[in-house]
Regions:
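An amphipathic alpha-helix adjacent to DNA-recognition modules
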Residues: 1-5, 9, 14-18, 23-26, ...
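Hydrophobic recognition helices of helix-based DNA-binding modules
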Residues: 4, 46, 50, 54, ...
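Short, hydrophobic secondary-structure boundary micro-motifs
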Residues: 16-17, 83-85, 147
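Basic/polar phosphate-binding segments, predominantly the helix-turn-helix DNA-binding elements
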Residues: 21-43, 74-87, 93-108, 154-165
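Amphipathic alpha-helical packing segments from all-alpha helical-bundle domains
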Residues: 70, 90-133, 163
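C-terminal peripheral helix-coil segments that are non-catalytic and often amphipathic
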Residues: 137-168
């Protein structure tokens, strides 16, 4: 995983090939494809693993602000890497879309699948899409606002029906 982060300091994700990654990491293409479908899958896996490791550090109780700030810290600590993930021409929609799908699943699991009907799923997807767009803008434009401002915006964007299930 460090190989791709190191390579992105030298060239864009568009220009990095699976061969480049394998050479830098000392792995064969076969090993790479055993774990990842493509380089974009690797980038998202880095985010997902980093976030999940950080979330494990939180206490077992649910704290919306702490969970959001943990997610945002993943981006701020590796801003250059994630900025490229959001902006490189062949990758942004892939990372953005995977980020949305992961966050929708995470939100539904946090609420409890049995409490989420089709209408709530649509509201969650819309809310997640908006929050991901905010994270993307924040990452790409230099993180001018602090993390608490973003968390407050996430709350303001959340539909009341989702708040009732997610924040209580």
């Amino acid at each position: 995983m460090n190989a791709i982060q190191d390579l992105t300091t030298k060239k864009s994700l568009d220009k990095i090939t699976v061969d480049d990654l394998c050479n830098a990491a000392g792995y064969s293409r076969q090993t790479f494809y055993r774990h990842y479908t493509d380089k974009y899958d690797l980038v998202f896996s880095i985010y997902q693993q980093t976030l999940e490791n950080r979330m494990e550090e939180l206490d077992d109780y649910w704290d919306f602000d702490a969970h959001c700030k943990t997610m945002l810290a993943c981006f701020s600590e590796n801003r250059a890497f994630y900025k490229k993930a959001f902006t490189d021409s062949s990758f942004p929609s892939s990372f953005h879309d995977r980020f949305i799908e992961y966050s929708v699943r995470y939100t539904i699991e946090a609420i409890g699948k049995h409490k989420v009907n089709k209408d709530i799923q649509i509201l969650i997807r819309c809310w997640v899409s908006n929050t991901i767009s905010l994270v993307e803008q924040w990452t790409v434009k230099g993180m001018e606002k602090d993390e608490q401002w973003l968390v407050d915006m996430f709350r303001r964007l959340m539909p009341e029906e989702v708040k009732a299930l997610y924040l209580n």
